[in-house]
Structure formats: C-alpha cells, structure tokens
C-alpha cells in the first residue's frame, strides 16, 4: 500500500501555462495557426506533461499485462483460458498483432505476467510479477482480495518508476486475458450505474445467445458483490482483473512520473478508469489511443474525459491501438521540435 499511497501523493495537475506556451510555439511555425489540428493538441499536451517545450522522443514501450479470469468458468468467452499463456508465448516470439504494430511504430513490447494460470520460464521480454494464478469467478465470489488488487496495482506503479529511471519517453498499455471484457463491462457498469446490457458486447466474437448469457452472468456478479462506486479498490477487487489492476498502476505511476501514457482499448481503459477514479488529475496524462468496437468503451472515455485519437474499428487489445497512436503522437512532437519558424524560414507571418 505504501507504493500506491506515494504515487497518489506525487500526482499533480498538468501546468496550464505550459500548454499555452507550447501552443504559442506551434503558432510560430510556418503554417496557419491550428492548421495541423489534433497533431498540435497532442504536441502541446506531450510538452506540458513532460514539462519540456522541446521534448525529446526516446524509447517508447508498450507494457502488455496478462492475467486469467475465473469468470471464464461461466462460458462468457469463445476461447478457453489456455489461450492466455499461448498468446503470451506468441508475444515473446514477436508474432502477435501488437509485436507487428509496435515494430512499425519503433516501440518495444514488454509482457508482464501479473496473473496467468501458467508457470513461465524466465524469458527475455517477460516480466514475471505474478500476484495469483488468475482471479476467482466473480459470479460466485469476489474476483480477488483487496490486498491482491493493491499488489497488482503496485506492479504497474513500479514499472512506471523503472521507466522513468530508464528515460523512457512514452509508455503504452496493452493486455491479454481470456474473458477480460466481462470484468471491464462490470467495472464501467458499477461506476456509471448503467445497465450491463448498455456496456456489454461480443468480446472475442460470441453469438447472440452467448451474449445474452454473458450479460446475465455479469449482472449476477454485480448483484452478488455490490461493488461500491465510491471506492475504486472495492470495484476492482470485487469484479476486476489482475491485468486491469496492473494497467491501473502503470497509468498512476506514469502520471506520478510525468510520463505520457497511451491507453489502448476497452480493457486497458477499464484500468485507466480505475486510476482516474483514484485520482482526478490522472486523466491529464492519458492519451486515448482509439475508439473500440466494444460498446462500453465510449462510456468509459466519456467518464474520464478522453478523446480517442483513432477510430479504426479495432477490438483486438494487446496494445495494438496504442502502438498505432504512438506514431501520431510522435509526429506531433516532431512538428513542435523540427518545423521551422517564420523567422527561420524567411516567411512573412500574418
């Protein structure tokens, strides 16, 4: 709990004056003011978050957190839980979607085992920080204890602290965990007070009958556990996931260390939402990578006040959207740093 409390105490609002100064710098580039649209918004936010009007773009890292889910026992996913460790091994071999898109973006992928029901051998690129071998079935009991939830959050915070020490310029979130759209739907339903049906979709591609079953299972879990929306740790521990907790910690740690954090899709945003509910200033450090096909994602983004960078009908997770968005954020930063001013170019300004 000490690491979590320390991180929360360090999170400060982003300096509004830096946002204004960064925009003034952009307005002096050889272009009409605001003509690069959202690229300029990304650039000024990146500068203000880092506290540097000429931010350096060094290493970019996507942390893909993996964990299993007891709720899979209820038949809410198209795939068995054995796919979770199989996909982790695919990540480590560099063969997954996130690996391909991260290579394209010039980002590194680090896989974090925070709760997979499998014993991995030590492998390059794999960070083993297992809190438990998956959550329990939240349709029958709490997904985890409060202590387990805090421990998983602190895994993410520690990784953000290490990223700061390494000089990493930008971090992204990703996840792998069969069944993890169910806890994500439960989390937003708990906070928003909406119906489960409004925030639950097909996940890995289940049919109509399976979707109806999934909605009933999630509702049963919420009715049983009665998570308190005023207590983010209560929501997380009762209906969440270990990888969702790890992501929440990474987002909190990034905010505490003034590192821009690119949040992927539905499951990653569930983690970011937990972080934002724990500290209101966290939202200022988040870049929402994209708008997911999962219907609950839009409600999450509205609640944290984040505008998605991309809308590509993505629903894979892993950090794929974060990898794509990182390239656009970096493009905005390059405009801020490399584009000539009117004076430098000998061009008359308005």
Curated annotation (Swiss-Prot):
MF GO annotations: nicotinate-nucleotide-dimethylbenzimidazole phosphoribosyltransferase activity
Superkingdom, natural source: Bacteria
Signal peptide as annotated in the record: none
A Pfam family that the UniProt record links to this protein: DBI_PRT
Keyword presence, Transferase: yes
Annotated active site: 318
Keyword Transcription regulation: no
Keywords of the record: Cobalamin biosynthesis, Glycosyltransferase, Transferase
Disulfide bonds: none
GO biological process, alphabetically ordered: cobalamin biosynthetic process
EC number: 2.4.2.21
Catalytic activity as recorded in UniProt: 5,6-dimethylbenzimidazole + nicotinate beta-D-ribonucleotide = alpha-ribazole 5'-phosphate + nicotinate + H(+)
UniProt pathway: Nucleoside biosynthesis; alpha-ribazole biosynthesis; alpha-ribazole from 5,6-dimethylbenzimidazole: step 1/2
CDD domains assigned to the protein according to its UniProt record, in alphabetical order: DMB-PRT_CobT
Task of the protein: Catalyzes the synthesis of alpha-ribazole-5'-phosphate from nicotinate mononucleotide (NAMN) and 5,6-dimethylbenzimidazole (DMB).
Membership in a protein family: Belongs to the CobT family.
HAMAP family per record: CobT
Protein name per UniProt: Nicotinate-nucleotide--dimethylbenzimidazole phosphoribosyltransferase
Organism per entry: Citrifermentans bemidjiense (strain ATCC BAA-1014 / DSM 16622 / JCM 12645 / Bem) (Geobacter bemidjiensis)
Organism lineage string: Bacteria, Pseudomonadati, Thermodesulfobacteriota, Desulfuromonadia, Geobacterales
């Amino acid at each position: 709990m000490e690491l979590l409390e320390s991180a929360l105490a360090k999170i400060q609002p982003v300096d509004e004056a830096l946002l204004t100064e960064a925009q003034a710098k952009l307005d002096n580039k050889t272009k009409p003011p605001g003509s690069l649209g959202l690229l300029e918004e990304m650039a000024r936010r990146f500068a203000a978050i880092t506290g540097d009007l000429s931010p350096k773009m060094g290493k970019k890292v996507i942390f893909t957190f993996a964990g299993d889910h007891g709720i899979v026992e209820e038949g809410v996913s198209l795939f068995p839980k054995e796919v979770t460790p199989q996909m982790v091994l695919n990540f480590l071999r560099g063969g997954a979607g996130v690996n391909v898109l991260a290579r394209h973006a010039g980002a590194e992928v680090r896989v974090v085992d925070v709760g997979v029901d499998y014993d991995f051998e030590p492998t390059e690129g794999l960070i083993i920080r297992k809190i438990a071998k998956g959550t329990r079935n939240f349709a029958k009991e709490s997904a985890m204890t409060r202590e387990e939830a805090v421990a998983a959050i602190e895994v993410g915070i520690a990784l953000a602290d290490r990223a700061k020490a390494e000089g990493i310029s930008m971090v992204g979130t990703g996840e792998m965990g069969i069944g993890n759209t169910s806890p994500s739907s439960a989390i937003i339903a708990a906070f928003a007070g909406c119906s489960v049906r409004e925030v639950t979709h097909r996940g890995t591609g289940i049919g109509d009958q399976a979707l109806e079953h999934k909605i009933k299972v999630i509702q049963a879990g919420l009715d049983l556990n009665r998570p308190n929306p005023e207590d983010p740790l209560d929501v997380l521990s009762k209906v969440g996931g270990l990888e969702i907790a790890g992501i929440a910690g990474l987002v909190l740690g990034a905010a505490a260390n003034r590192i821009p954090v690119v949040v992927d899709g539905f499951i990653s945003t569930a983690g970011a939402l937990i972080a934002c509910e724990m500290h209101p200033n966290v939202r200022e450090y988040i870049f929402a990578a994209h708008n997911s096909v999962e219907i609950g994602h839009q409600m999450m983004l509205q609640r944290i006040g984040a505008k998605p960078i991309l809308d590509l009908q993505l629903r894979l997770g892993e950090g794929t959207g974060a990898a794509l968005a990182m390239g656009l954020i970096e493009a905005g930063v390059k405009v801020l740093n490399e584009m000539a001013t009117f004076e430098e170019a000998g061009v008359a300004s308005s």
